């Protein structure tokens, strides 16, 4: 098999903060589909990898649904709705997009979709019937047959909003029935008669917004489950009334709602009664899901089991008692600890042996049923990621993990999980070093287990890894613990905790830890308030669950750096790990100054003033002789390190070269910059769609005699450049490898070499396909250090790794074939 030039190795993401943004394909090996920003992600829970991305929406994906087959086999069609007012029907083959069709017509964001297969009255051929609800107070019915899509009908709800929809067919007929739950606590039932959906009745009972409705067929009865913000679940039974009239015998009967339909010229009376009310949740019930039918021993089974998810952080599995028929709570699972707000959705998977929920903060919680004790469910490892735009990322110096930071106010650490006696390696989030109260903006590694981060505040914060993290990281990634702790202080803290109403991670040492009794743990329940989260060390052999990440993987904060007048915007560290450079948002020259800090004394070394607006990115040259800065004022500045006479003195920098409004090639904000690995050239990328190479840089040159000018042709990439990164190694032709990230989400890889003919200096090597690309702007690109391990195949082909992050909430790791560039 011929390998491609560019591959996506790993993806880190999580579901959007929207009800209905997750759907699990029924059947063994079914894929989990969920919306991440503007993209639909297909994830394999068994292999724990992202299979592909479906990119087609231009705004947040709010809802999606696999169109399930009648025989319980895995579906190949998926429907999604988004805030771009569109519904997209995806047809898949071998888990890849075969074709997609846009259903346009809504005038507001789409918040609910559902679909079923329907046989045509004339030819009997199956086609998809799709219902979608949007904030324009309408529900639209669509028919998709082959490549033809048409809107069958528009149901208008005046000033009300339909929040959830579900389609099915009436028992013993082919008539589709539609249930719509609205913001008035009512469920509206529509039945298709003569190719037209007619309203039959409204079911009342809920006292708040309806958040979910779902049909399920059991025998000759059709059951409808509904959930609401009144904390209750109602189950309705719909059945065909016999034609023979029965005499009233005076017995007590449940109230019936009836309506009449015509099927083939025969009138049939349909009755709807309230089967039961389930009260077990203590907060809004956001989602319900019937267990799908599945084949067992060649027989199609439809279990009578219902799953519900609530804002009370629990998910409940309901089923009727075998003897009495009373619906009872069978299993309750949930989330403990942390500043979280409950579950938004839930799904059955793997023939009911697995259940999953996604939470307000994006985290997914997966549980698997024990084969020994069916009433026991254990947490499983599942994908995780940021739930807002990812602003910065960096590899550790040895290329063994990456740290990312985001406007979701968290810093996360992703590393490989190397299982014992298994060759397959998967990457997972293994720590959350910082959970902050401000949106995080930037970070830089100081050494392997120490980093500094900047947020929408004036302070830089420095964090160091605790002993518990280093020990767990060595086990999960199968690294030598003695090698990791070789240069570390023996007095490492065990972990960290955040005081109540505090923003600083306080170190916890072995003597500070208290182990709680069961009675003391009860006092930490929500009934007794929310006290300070207490760190509890744990020995891990696999990636941690969300509960553990929230409260047991923080890194202690060892230093605060004060000096900037406004919010921190960028930070970087030199290669010898002795100096930090930071800059903040600025509208005046005095605030746009770069501050240099010593990493040993944590004191300010120097303030470098040149730019008049915000410095957007900085980079030290690989030999640490220069510091490059680019700015919103459309210029760059190059600072030269001056030699000092004694080691007692900190180094200082002087302005070596710069551009101004006349000499600057760029006409818009310069977003990014990077150095060539030999420190001869530097690259700048701007919003004006240009990438320019500058040089040659030599600290022994006099900049007046040898000015630094563009030494390349201007590369126009066709979209705003937001990130530039130069690979630390050259391609086989000894050309520089440059990755360029665009505002459109695409990543392009070029090679460049200085030539006498400037028009031929740039070569386009490869660019990401739509499914490989981000869906919003790239924020940072970073190549893996080649001091780490570089994979080599049997043919001796070297693979280079780089990571990307963007405003689409996603972090990706790519592999690129060096010999093909």
From Swiss-Prot:
Q: Where in the cell is it found?
A: Cytoplasm; Nucleus
- Kindly tell me the pathway this chain contributes to: tRNA modification; 5-methoxycarbonylmethyl-2-thiouridine-tRNA biosynthesis
* WD repeat intervals: 56-100, 105-152, 160-200, 205-246, 280-328, 338-377, 385-424, 435-473, 563-607, 610-649, 665-704, 716-760, 773-821
Q: Which InterPro entries match?
A: Elp2, WD40/YVTN_repeat-like_dom_sf, WD40_repeat_dom_sf, WD40_rpt
GO molecular function list: protein kinase binding; RNA polymerase II complex binding
Q: Which GO terms describe its cellular component?
A: cytosol; elongator holoenzyme complex; transcription elongation factor complex
Where are the annotated coiled coils located? Answer: none
SMART domains the record matches: WD40 (SM00320)
Q: Which PROSITE patterns match?
A: WD_REPEATS_2 (PS50082), WD_REPEATS_REGION (PS50294)
UniProt keyword list: Cytoplasm, Nucleus, Repeat, tRNA processing, WD repeat
A Pfam match: WD40
**GO biological process annotations for this chain's record?**
regulation of receptor signaling pathway via JAK-STAT; tRNA wobble uridine modification
Its domain comment says:
Folds into a two seven-bladed beta-propeller structure which is required for elongator complex assembly.
Q: How is this protein organized at the quaternary level?
A: Component of the elongator complex which consists of ELP1, ELP2, ELP3, ELP4, ELP5 and ELP6. Interacts with STAT3 and JAKs.
Q: What family is this?
A: Belongs to the WD repeat ELP2 family.
The free-text function statement in the UniProt record for this protein reads:
Component of the elongator complex which is required for multiple tRNA modifications, including mcm5U (5-methoxycarbonylmethyl uridine), mcm5s2U (5-methoxycarbonylmethyl-2-thiouridine), and ncm5U (5-carbamoylmethyl uridine). The elongator complex catalyzes the formation of carboxymethyluridine in the wobble base at position 34 in tRNAs.
Record-given protein name: Elongator complex protein 2
Which organism is this protein's natural source? Answer: Rattus norvegicus
| The gene coding this protein | Elp2
């Amino acid at each position: 098999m011929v390998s491609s030039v560019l591959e996506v190795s790993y993806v880190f993401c999580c579901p959007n903060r929207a009800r209905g943004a997750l759907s699990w394909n029924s059947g063994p090996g079914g894929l989990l589909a969920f919306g991440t920003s503007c993209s639909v992600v297909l994830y394999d829970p068994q292999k724990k990898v992202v299979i592909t991305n479906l990119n087609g929406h231009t705004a947040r994906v709010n809802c999606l649904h696999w169109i399930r087959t009648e025989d319980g086999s895995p579906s190949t069609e998926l429907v999604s709705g988004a805030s771009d007012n569109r519904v997209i029907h995806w047809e898949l083959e071998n888990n890849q997009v075969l074709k997609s069709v846009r259903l346009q017509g809504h005038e507001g964001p789409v918040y609910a979709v559902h679909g079923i297969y329907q046989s045509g009255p004339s030819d009997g051929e199956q086609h998809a019937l799709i219902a979608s609800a949007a904030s324009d107070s309408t529900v639209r019915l669509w028919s998709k047959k082959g490549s033809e899509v048409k809107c069958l009908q528009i149901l208008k709800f005046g000033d009300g909003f339909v929040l959830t929809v579900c389609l099915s067919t009436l028992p013993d007929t082919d008539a589709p029935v539609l249930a719509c739950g609205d913001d008035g606590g009512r469920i509206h039932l529509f039945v298709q008669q003569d190719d037209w959906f007619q309203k039959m009745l409204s079911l009342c009972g809920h006292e708040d917004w309806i958040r979910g409705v779902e049909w399920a067929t059991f025998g000759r009865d059709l059951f409808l489950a509904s959930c609401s913000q009144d904390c209750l679940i109602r189950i309705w039974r719909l059945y065909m009334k016999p034609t023979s009239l029965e005499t009233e015998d005076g017995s007590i009967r449940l109230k019936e709602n009836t309506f009449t339909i015509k099927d083939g010229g025969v009138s049939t009376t349909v009755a709807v009664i309230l089967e039961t009310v389930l009260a077990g949740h203590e907060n809004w019930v956001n989602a319900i899901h019937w267990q799908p039918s599945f084949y067992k021993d060649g027989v199609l089974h439809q279990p009578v089991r219902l799953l519900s998810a609530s804002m009370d952080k629990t998910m409940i599995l309901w089923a009727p008692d075998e003897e009495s028929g009373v619906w009872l709570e069978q299993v309750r699972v949930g989330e403990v600890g942390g500043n979280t707000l409950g579950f938004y959705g839930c799904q059955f998977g793997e023939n009911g042996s697995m259940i999953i929920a996604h939470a307000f903060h994006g985290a997914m919680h997966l549980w698997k049923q024990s084969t020994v004790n069916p009433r026991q469910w254990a947490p499983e490892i599942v994908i995780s990621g940021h739930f807002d735009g990812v602003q910065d990322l960096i590899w550790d110096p040895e290329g063994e993990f990456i740290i990312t930071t985001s406007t979701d106010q968290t810093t996360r650490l992703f590393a490989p999980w190397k299982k014992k006696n298994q060759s397959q390696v998967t990457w997972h989030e293994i720590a959350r070093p910082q959970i902050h109260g401000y949106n995080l903006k930037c970070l830089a590694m100081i050494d392997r287990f120490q980093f500094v981060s900047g947020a929408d505040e004036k302070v830089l914060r420095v964090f160091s890894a605790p002993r518990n993290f280093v020990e767990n990281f060595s086990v999960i990634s199968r690294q030598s613990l003695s090698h990791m702790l070789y240069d570390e202080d023996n007095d490492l803290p065990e972990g960290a905790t955040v005081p109540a109403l505090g923003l600083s991670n306080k170190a916890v040492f072995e003597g500070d830890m208290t182990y709680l009794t069961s009675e003391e743990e009860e006092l930490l329940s929500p009934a007794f308030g929310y006290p300070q989260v207490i760190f509890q060390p744990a020995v891990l052999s696999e990636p941690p669950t969300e509960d553990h990440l929230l409260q047991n993987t923080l890194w202690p904060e060892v230093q605060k750096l004060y000096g900037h007048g406004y919010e921190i915007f960028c930070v970087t560290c030199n290669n010898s790990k002795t100096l930090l450079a930071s800059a903040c948002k600025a509208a005046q020259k005095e605030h746009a100054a770069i501050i240099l800090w010593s990493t040993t004394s944590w004191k300010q070394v120097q303030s470098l003033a040149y730019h008049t607006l915000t410095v957007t990115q900085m980079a030290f040259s690989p030999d640490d002789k220069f510091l490059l800065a680019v700015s919103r004022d459309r210029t760059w500045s190059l600072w030269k390190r001056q030699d000092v006479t004694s080691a007692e003195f900190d180094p200082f920098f002087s302005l070596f070269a710069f551009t101004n409004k006349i000499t600057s090639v760029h006409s818009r904000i310069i977003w990014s910059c990077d150095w060539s690995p030999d420190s001869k050239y530097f690259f700048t990328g701007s919003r004006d769609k240009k990438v320019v190479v500058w040089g040659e840089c030599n600290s022994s040159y006099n900049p007046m005699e040898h000015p630094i000018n563009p030494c390349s042709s201007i590369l126009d990439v066709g979209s705003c450049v937001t990130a530039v990164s130069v690979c630390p190694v050259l391609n086989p032709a000894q050309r520089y490898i440059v990755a360029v990230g665009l505002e459109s989400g695409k990543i392009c890889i070029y090679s460049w070499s200085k030539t006498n003919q400037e028009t031929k200096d740039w070569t386009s090597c490869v660019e990401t396909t739509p499914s490989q690309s981000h869906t919003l702007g790239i924020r940072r690109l970073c190549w893996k250090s080649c001091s780490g391990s570089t994979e080599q195949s049997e043919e001796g082909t070297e693979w280079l790794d780089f990571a990307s992050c963007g405003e689409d909430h996603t972090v990706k790791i790519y592999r690129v074939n060096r010999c093909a560039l």
